Amino acid sequence: MVVTKYYFIVASNQFLITEEPLEEVLRERIQYYRITKKRIDFWLLPKPTFLQSKLYKDLTKQLPENCIAIVSTNKIFITWLKLRLNNVFIGKFLGPTEQIQNPLGFEL
């Protein structure tokens, strides 16, 4: 099994979807990836299941139940998003592991 390092930002769904121009930001990023022929390396996850890990017990106490995450293998992209969006939490994890079996899992 190949273990990958993932980076993420997470915030309330209300904040990222309604209050911030997230759609525009992601659309521009996808366009940039197409122009540079780079493979998409980020995912938008509603109610990400990796947050159910014991690793994030303290973080989930600070988040609303209805949160959303952007997960990527690109640390620079996540750092850029943090600077662009401000009111988000940032973190990283390895997956798949025993604690996080489905790194890109989510609930609807």
Residue ranges and their predicted role:
Residues 53-108:
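Polybasic, proline/glycine-rich intrinsically disordered low-complexity segments
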Residues 31-35, 58-61:
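Beta-strand elements of modular eukaryotic interaction domains
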Residues 13-17, 39, 106:
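Structured alpha/beta or helical-core interaction and ligand-binding surfaces enriched in interleaved
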Residues 12-21, 49-53, 76-77:
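Short acidic, S/G/P-rich loop/turn micro-motifs used as interaction or catalytic elements
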Residues 1-2:
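N-terminal chloroplast transit peptides
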Residues 19-30:
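Well-ordered, non-membrane alpha-helical segments in soluble/globular domains
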